[in-house]
């Protein structure tokens, strides 16, 4: 299992700093992750409420997650001109890229907004109800994300500006972060993020397998918006065979109706022309 885990995540990023516990969901399995663990596409991280974890990428980009943050490496591009994507479901995060390759960009998805950045440094606080982003330096593009995953008009923000999106309201752009944002921000976010990757070039750690994911482990992700939870049905379908996982899926089906076809496949079977129930095939209750 350890060999499979490391092969899964060869090039995307490395955990270079860990304070407190870090849970890693890879595939449908939960691991404990430590400094030196390599990360790959699809990896989901949950950070200790009192801790932090820093990910450094091969192109020099750095992402620090703090105070219970939950994030997923959705797609990490390998080429210099590619666009990498990271979902931050909740909590605090600071990202920076001092010298991005020509055309290289990172897109950060939150439940309420999307930010695309090249050479920029920013701090964000994300939750289901709101997203706040302080652009420390550089420039970014941002847009609102609706409950159904629809992207709004793309707007620009530059160093010093503060983006706030609450609920379904239109995002506001202010000249400085709010006092409350600064007060609640993790203290180490006031400083530049340290560059630690070179120290770990010859160090490789393997995540420790804990257990197959429970519904509680992934509940918040399964209930996220369409732009964040795509591919989750295929990824976690194997866990629907577990009786408790299945029970919770059914109990919360309204929050993730895309699971209906997995849970009740008979509703979607094609009926023969002589089947008295053929007129009801494919209906969804």
Which positions does each model-derived feature cover?
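Extended, charge-rich intrinsically disordered regulatory tails
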Residues: 276-281
């Amino acid at each position: 299992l350890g060999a499979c885990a490391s092969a899964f995540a060869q090039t995307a990023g490395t955990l270079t700093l860990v304070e407190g516990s870090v849970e890693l969901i890879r595939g449908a399995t939960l691991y404990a992750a430590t400094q030196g663990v390599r990360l790959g596409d699809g990896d989901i991280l949950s950070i200790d409420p009192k801790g932090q974890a820093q990910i450094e990428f091969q192109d020099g980009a750095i992402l620090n997650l703090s105070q219970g943050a939950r994030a997923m490496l959705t797609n990490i591009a390998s080429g210099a001109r590619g666009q990498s994507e990271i979902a931050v479901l909740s909590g605090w995060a600071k990202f920076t890229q001092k010298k991005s390759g020509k055309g290289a960009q990172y897109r950060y998805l939150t439940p309420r907004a999307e930010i695309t950045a090249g050479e920029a440094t920013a701090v964000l606080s994300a939750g289901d109800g709101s997203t706040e982003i302080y652009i420390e330096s550089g420039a970014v593009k941002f847009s609102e994300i609706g409950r159904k995953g629809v992207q709004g008009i793309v707007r620009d923000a530059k160093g010093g500006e503060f983006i706030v999106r609450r609920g379904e309201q239109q995002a506001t752009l202010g000249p400085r972060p709010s006092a409350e944002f600064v007060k609640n921000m993790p203290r180490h976010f006031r400083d530049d993020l340290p560059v630690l990757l070179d120290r770990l070039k010859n160090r490789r750690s393997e995540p420790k397998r804990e257990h197959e994911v429970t519904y509680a482990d992934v509940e918040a992700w399964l209930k996220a918006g369409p732009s964040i939870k795509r591919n989750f049905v295929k990824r976690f379908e194997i866990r629907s065979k577990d009786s408790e996982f299945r029970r919770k899926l059914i109990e919360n089906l309204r929050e993730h109706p895309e699971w209906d076809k997995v849970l009740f496949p008979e509703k979607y079977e094609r009926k023969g022309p002589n089947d008295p129930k053929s007129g009801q095939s494919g209906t969804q209750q």
